[in-house]
C-alpha cells in the first residue's frame, strides 16, 4: 500500500475483496495484487486524507490495523492521517450498518442463508503469538471497551458490593499476620517449562540444576490432539522423575463458541493426567478479552463441563479462577459465578507486579505483600474455594529482547527501544528473589510458579543467545537460592532500617539471613553476627554494604 501510494496511485475502493494474495514459500512472502481499479485516481502526491481513505474499507480488527499503520509509516503516523482515518472508518461502518434499512429484502434474505465461510466477526478473532507464548491483542482499547457488556459490568459491581466489605475486613486481619509465622519453603517454588517449541530434554538438563522443583505445564485448546499427546508424554516423564506437576488449561475463543470441542479437550487432558498431577488450573487470564473470555457467562460455559468430569476424576484437584494482575474485583466476581458443584481446591492467580518495577513498589498504596494479603483475604472469605493461594504465573519482561518481550509492540518502529516495563537481566534476578520471599514468607501465598525456565523475552535461560542456550544471572541466583533455602524454614523478619529487608531462615545446623535494601544502600550495622557471607549467585563476600541485590549471611 505504501509503495502504491508513494507512486501516486489512489485506489478509492480498497476493501479486502479487491486484494489478492499469493502464498509465500520458504519464508519469502508472496505477491500482493490490487484489483478493481476503475475508481482510481493518479496524483503527483497523495494527501494524508487520501491515504487515510484507502484504509477506510479494510476489514481488519483494530489491533492489527494499528500494526498495519505502523508498518505503513515506519514511524509515528501523522495526526492528520489518524484523524482522517478514524473519521473515514466510522463513516464506512455507518454505511455498512445502514444497509439493513437501505436494502431490507436483500439483508433479510442474506440473514436467512448465512455463509459458513464468511468473515469471522472481529470479536471472535483469536490468534496465538508463539514468540511471547500468549494470545495476541486483536482489538484496540476502544473496541474492547465497546464490546464489553454493561450487564456484565453490573454483575461484577454487584458482586463486589456484596462480598467486598467482608474481604476488606479480612484483609486488615491478614495484614497484621505478615511474616509472623514459620514457613517451610520445601516444594513452594515451581518452574514452568515449554512443551511446544523448545527441546524438552534439554530443558530437563537445566532443571536438574535446580533440584527437583515442582513444574507447571500448559495444555492449550488451540494446539490440537497431537501436541496434547506430546505434552502428556512429557508430563509422564516429569512424574516418573519425581517432580510435582501442576497443569494449566488454556482456552481460546473457539472454546467458547464450540463447547463440544472444548469438552472433548478437557476429557482428553483429565484422562491422561489423572493420578499424576497436584493441581489443574482451569482456564487462563479470564479477565482479559484477548484470551477469548468476554464475559462472566463465557467463563461459566467453560467451567460447566468440569462439574461432571470432576465426578469421574475425584483425585484431581482444581484451582482458579486464574485472573491476572491487581484486578481483584474480577476475582471476586468470577469466584461467585463458579457453577454449583465446582469448588476450587485453591485460589490461583497470575500476580504480576512488573509494571511497578521492583516488587516493593506501590500501586495505589499496595505493594506485593499487600496485594498477596488481599488475595489471601478473598480466598478466606469465599465459599467457592479453599484458603490456599497459588501464584501460577509471574515474571519480569527483559530489555533488548524486542518482539519476544511480552510487553513490547509486536511491530517495533525504527529507533524504538521497547516498553519501559522491560528490565535488565540483573534486575530480573533481584526482583525474582525478592518477590519469592515476600509472597511466601509473608504467609499469604502457598506456592509460586515462575514463568518460565527458557524464553528469550522473559525466561531464566535465553535460547536465542549466540553460541546456544545461555543461563542468565537470574538462573544462577535461583540455583543458589534453592540450594541455600529451598528446604529451609522461614523464622522471622528482623527489624532493621526503613526499606531494609532481613529475613531469617533456619536450616538443620545453622541459620541464614537474606538481606537487601530497596531503593538505596545500607551500610550497617548488620542485624546478626555471621560466619560467612555470599552474594546473590553464591560468591563469598566481605559485605560493607547491601543494595538491591540480595546477600546471604550464615550464622552457627
Region locations from a protein language model:
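Catalytic-loop of the protein kinase fold
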Residues: 9-16
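Catalytic domains of carbohydrate-active enzymes, especially glycoside hydrolases
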Residues: 163-166, 182-224, 234-237, 244-246
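Noncatalytic carbohydrate-binding groove/subsite architecture in carbohydrate-active enzymes
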Residues: 296-435, 442-444
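Carbohydrate-binding surface patches
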Residues: 495-529, 536
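C-terminal beta-strand-rich structural cap/linker in extracellular carbohydrate-active enzymes
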Residues: 539-556
Amino acid at each position: 500500500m505504501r509503495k502504491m501510494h508513494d507512486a501516486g496511485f489512489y485506489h478509492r475502493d480498497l476493501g479486502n475483496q479487491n486484494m489478492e494474495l499469493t502464498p509465500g514459500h520458504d519464508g519469502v512472502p508472496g505477491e500482493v495484487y490490487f484489483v478493481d481499479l476503475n475508481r482510481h485516481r493518479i496524483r503527483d502526491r497523495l494527501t494524508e486524507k487520501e491515504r487515510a481513505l484507502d484504509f477506510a474499507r479494510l476489514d481488519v480488527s483494530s489491533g492489527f490495523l494499528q500494526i498495519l499503520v505502523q508498518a505503513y509509516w515506519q514511524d509515528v503516523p501523522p495526526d492528520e492521517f489518524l484523524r482522517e482515518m478514524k473519521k473515514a472508518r466510522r463513516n464506512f461502518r455507518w454505511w455498512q450498518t445502514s444497509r439493513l434499512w437501505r436494502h431490507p429484502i436483500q439483508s433479510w434474505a442474506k440473514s436467512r442463508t448465512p455463509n459458513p465461510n464468511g468473515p469471522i466477526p472481529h470479536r471472535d478473532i483469536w490468534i496465538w503469538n508463539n514468540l511471547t507464548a500468549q494470545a495476541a491483542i486483536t482489538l484496540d482499547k476502544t473496541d474492547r471497551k465497546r464490546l464489553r457488556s454493561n450487564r456484565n459490568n453490573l454483575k461484577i459491581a454487584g458482586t463486589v458490593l456484596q462480598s467486598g466489605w467482608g474481604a476488606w475486613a479480612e484483609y486488615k486481619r491478614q495484614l497484621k499476620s505478615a511474616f509472623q509465622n514459620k514457613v517451610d519453603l520445601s516444594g513452594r517454588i515451581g518452574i514452568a517449562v515449554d512443551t511446544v517449541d523448545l527441546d524438552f530434554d534439554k530443558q530437563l538438563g537445566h532443571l536438574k540444576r535446580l533440584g527437583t522443583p515442582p513444574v507447571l505445564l500448559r495444555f492449550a485448546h488451540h494446539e490440537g490432539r497431537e501436541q496434547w499427546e506430546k505434552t502428556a508424554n512429557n508430563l509422564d516423564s516429569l512424574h516418573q522423575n519425581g517432580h510435582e506437576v501442576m497443569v494449566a488449561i488454556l482456552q481460546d475463543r473457539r472454546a467458547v463458541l464450540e463447547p463440544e470441542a472444548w469438552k472433548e479437550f478437557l476429557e482428553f487432558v483429565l484422562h491422561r493426567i489423572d493420578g499424576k498431577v497436584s493441581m489443574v488450573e482451569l482456564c487462563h487470564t479470564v479477565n482479559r478479552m484477548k484470551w477469548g473470555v468476554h464475559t462472566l457467562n463465557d467463563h461459566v460455559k467453560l467451567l460447566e463441563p468440569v462439574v461432571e468430569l470432576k465426578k469421574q476424576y475425584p483425585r484431581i484437584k482444581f484451582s482458579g479462577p486464574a485472573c491476572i494482575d491487581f484486578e481483584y474485583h474480577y476475582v471476586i466476581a468470577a469466584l461467585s459465578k463458579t457453577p454449583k458443584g465446582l469448588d476450587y481446591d485453591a485460589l490461583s492467580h497470575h500476580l504480576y507486579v512488573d509494571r511497578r518495577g521492583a516488587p516493593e513498589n506501590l500501586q495505589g498504596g499496595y505493594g506485593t505483600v499487600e496485594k498477596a494479603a488481599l488475595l489471601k483475604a478473598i480466598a478466606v472469605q469465599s465459599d467457592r474455594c479453599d484458603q490456599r493461594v497459588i501464584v501460577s504465573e509471574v515474571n519480569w519482561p527483559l530489555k533488548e529482547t524486542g518482539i519476544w518481550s511480552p510487553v513490547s509492540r509486536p511491530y517495533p518502529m525504527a529507533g524504538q527501544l521497547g516498553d519501559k516495563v522491560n528490565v535488565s537481566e540483573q534486575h530480573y534476578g533481584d526482583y525474582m528473589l525478592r518477590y519469592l520471599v515476600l509472597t511466601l514468607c509473608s504467609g499469604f501465598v502457598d506456592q509460586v510458579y515462575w514463568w518460565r525456565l527458557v524464553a528469550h523475552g522473559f525466561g531464566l535461560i535465553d535460547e536465542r543467545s549466540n553460541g546456544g542456550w545461555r543461563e542468565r544471572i537470574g538462573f544462577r541466583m535461583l540455583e543458589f537460592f534453592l540450594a541455600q533455602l529451598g528446604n529451609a524454614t522461614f523464622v522471622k523478619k528482623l527489624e532493621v532500617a526503613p526499606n531494609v529487608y532481613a529475613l531469617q531462615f533456619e536450616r538443620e545446623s545453622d541459620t541464614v539471613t537474606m538481606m537487601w535494601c530497596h531503593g538505596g544502600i545500607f551500610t550497617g550495622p548488620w542485624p546478626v553476627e555471621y560466619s560467612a557471607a555470599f552474594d546473590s549467585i553464591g560468591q563469598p563476600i566481605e559485605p560493607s554494604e547491601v543494595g538491591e541485590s540480595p546477600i546471604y549471611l550464615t550464622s552457627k
